[in-house]
Amino acid sequence: MIGKLKGLVDSQGEDYVILDVNGVGYVVHCSSRTLQNLPPQGQATALAIDTQMREDSIKLYGFASETEREWFRLLQSVQGVGAKVALAIQGVLRPGEIVTAIAAQDRAAFARASGVGAKLAARILAELKDKAPALGASLHTLAGAGSEGAGVEAPASGAVSDAISVLVNLGFGRSQAAVAVAASSKALGSGAGAGDLAKRALQELAQSG
């Protein structure tokens, strides 16, 4: 099994890149977003790899990060979502945007991907809400912070830090999370708890995405 490839960009097709690793060209299928972000031909790059073996073929799928690879696998756990559809979804939604869409039960976000209709979008939302470990844990954190934390005011810096951690666990970049939480803190005031800060930040990120 191949878990990672590091080499030179040789050429690109509609849905794949040929990666030259020590003179051997590997055909790696990628989302449109990943392909667009690859360096120019002849430049070095590294991709996290998911290897899928069938009776008549072996296919490699490449991702800019391990988080993207895990979402690729998780998306395929939904009935009706194969590798092609999973890549199509990742072509229009970043990991953090997938999480936001699931949390908001946003069918339209998934329906933007080729091959995803209203019924499949609804199935993805229903199944991944329970299957995504990071999502489930973070939503639980949000719920706890919003209820059990009532009446106990945490220091503002601690609440901000906790809210940022929640967003990072949901797949957002730390800098992106910090900006969103800072905006939430400014809007809600210094006494806001981590749960409220994270919830508002998620709303801000969903609107800006």
Swiss-Prot record:
Region (Domain III): 155-209
Subcellular location: Cytoplasm
Entry remark concerning the domains of this protein: Has three domains with a flexible linker between the domains II and III and assumes an 'L' shape. Domain III is highly mobile and contacts RuvB.
Domain of life of the native organism: Bacteria
Name this protein carries in UniProt: Holliday junction branch migration complex subunit RuvA
GO molecular function list: ATP binding; four-way junction DNA binding; four-way junction helicase activity
Residue span of region Flexible linker: 144-154
Recorded family membership: Belongs to the RuvA family.
Region feature (Domain II): 65-143
Task performed by this protein: The RuvA-RuvB-RuvC complex processes Holliday junction (HJ) DNA during genetic recombination and DNA repair, while the RuvA-RuvB complex plays an important role in the rescue of blocked DNA replication forks via replication fork reversal (RFR). RuvA specifically binds to HJ cruciform DNA, conferring on it an open structure. The RuvB hexamer acts as an ATP-dependent pump, pulling dsDNA into and through the RuvAB complex. HJ branch migration allows RuvC to scan DNA until it finds its consensus sequence, where it cleaves and resolves the cruciform DNA.
Annotated region (Domain I), positions in chain: 1-64
Taxonomic lineage of the native organism: Bacteria, Pseudomonadati, Pseudomonadota, Alphaproteobacteria, Hyphomicrobiales
Keyword presence, DNA damage: yes
GO CC terms, sorted: cytoplasm; Holliday junction resolvase complex
Entry keywords, A to Z: Cytoplasm, DNA damage, DNA recombination, DNA repair, DNA-binding
DNA-binding listed as a keyword: yes
Organism: Methylocella silvestris (strain DSM 15510 / CIP 108128 / LMG 27833 / NCIMB 13906 / BL2)
GO BP annotation list: DNA recombination; DNA repair
Assembly: Homotetramer. Forms an RuvA(8)-RuvB(12)-Holliday junction (HJ) complex. HJ DNA is sandwiched between 2 RuvA tetramers; dsDNA enters through RuvA and exits via RuvB. An RuvB hexamer assembles on each DNA strand where it exits the tetramer. Each RuvB hexamer is contacted by two RuvA subunits (via domain III) on 2 adjacent RuvB subunits; this complex drives branch migration. In the full resolvosome a probable DNA-RuvA(4)-RuvB(12)-RuvC(2) complex forms which resolves the HJ.
